[in-house]
Every structure is written in structure tokens, then in C-alpha cells.
């Protein structure tokens, strides 16, 4: 199994990902080396972060709010590039939006969908899929577009998860 590291400054996402990780580790579906850690605007880059990430296989990071110009990110980004760590940094709402390295487009789309649709099932599968990118076992259940992540219309024949599909659909 691989070492998957998830970092976030989003309280709810961090809490749910922490539970998902603990469940998967208890079920021996994910390495006990995998980690979920909380960040803040004031997080300081230090030796502990270096130790955590130097043997990581993949980094998933959800960042909201301030840009990626914090002192922490100014140290993190060169570190992960130097160590050729695979990563996906979702920094929606910042100038950068997202940063990706070492993850193929198809795999990235699945990772994004698991995160977007949210819910414990999708968060568990996000970890499993990230692990699968490294082990070659990506036959994980597809992202489940939960109804709270969709567009509702009482006459719709399906659930729409994006405005383009909904606007071209016939709902009558």
C-alpha cells in the first residue's frame, strides 16, 4: 500500500476525510502511514512537515481562502517539486485554482469528482483511488453524484451534476 497524505484548511472536509482515513486503516484497506492533517493560514513549515512528506507517495490538498502565497506554501511547493511527489492541490478561489503533477488527466477527473460529490462514501473512495493510482488498482467504485451535489427538477429523468447538461436537457 502507498502513503497517501491529505491536507486541508477546510474544517468539515478535514473532519470527514479524517474519519474516512481511520475507517480504511482499521479495515486494512489503506496504509497506516497515510495521514490526514489540518492546515491554517498560520501553519509553519518545519522538519515535521518534511518528514511527513518526504516518503509520501501522493499528496492531496484542499485549500480555500487565502492564496498559495503563505510562508507554508512558499516552502511546501519547492519541496514537493524537488522530491517529485505526485500531487493535486485544489485551491479553488485562489489565483492558482489548482496545481497538479504526476497525475494523469483521467485519474485527476475522478479525484475531482470524488471530492466534489462529497459524502463519506466518496471520501473513502477518494483515498482508495489515490492509493490505486500508485498500485495500479483503480477499479474503485465510480464517484457517486449525491443528490445534494446536483440540480433538481421534478420532471427530470435523471440527476444533473452540471449546468450545461441540465440546460440542454428536456425536462418536460
Which residues are covered by each model-predicted region?
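An N-terminal assembly and electron-transfer interface module characteristic of large anaerobic redox
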Residues: 1-172
Amino acid at each position: 500500500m502507498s502513503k497517501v497524505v491529505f491536507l486541508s484548511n477546510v474544517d468539515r472536509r478535514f473532519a470527514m476525510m479524517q474519519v474516512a482515513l481511520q475507517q480504511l486503516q482499521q479495515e486494512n484497506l489503506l496504509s497506516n502511514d497515510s495521514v490526514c492533517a489540518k492546515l491554517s493560514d498560520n501553519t509553519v513549515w518545519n522538519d515535521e512537515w518534511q518528514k511527513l512528506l518526504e516518503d509520501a507517495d501522493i499528496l492531496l490538498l484542499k485549500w480555500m481562502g487565502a492564496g498559495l502565497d503563505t510562508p507554508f506554501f512558499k516552502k511546501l511547493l519547492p519541496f514537493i517539486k524537488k522530491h517529485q511527489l505526485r500531487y493535486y492541490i485544489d485551491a479553488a478561489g485562489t489565483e492558482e485554482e489548482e496545481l497538479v503533477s504526476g497525475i494523469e488527466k483521467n485519474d485527476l477527473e475522478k479525484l475531482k469528482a470524488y471530492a466534489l460529490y462529497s459524502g463519506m462514501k466518496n471520501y473513502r473512495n477518494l483515498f482508495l483511488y489515490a492509493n490505486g493510482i500508485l498500485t495500479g488498482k483503480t477499479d474503485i467504485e465510480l464517484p457517486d453524484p449525491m443528490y445534494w451535489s446536483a440540480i433538481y427538477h421534478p420532471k427530470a429523468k435523471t440527476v444533473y451534476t452540471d449546468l450545461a447538461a441540465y440546460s440542454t436537457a428536456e425536462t418536460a
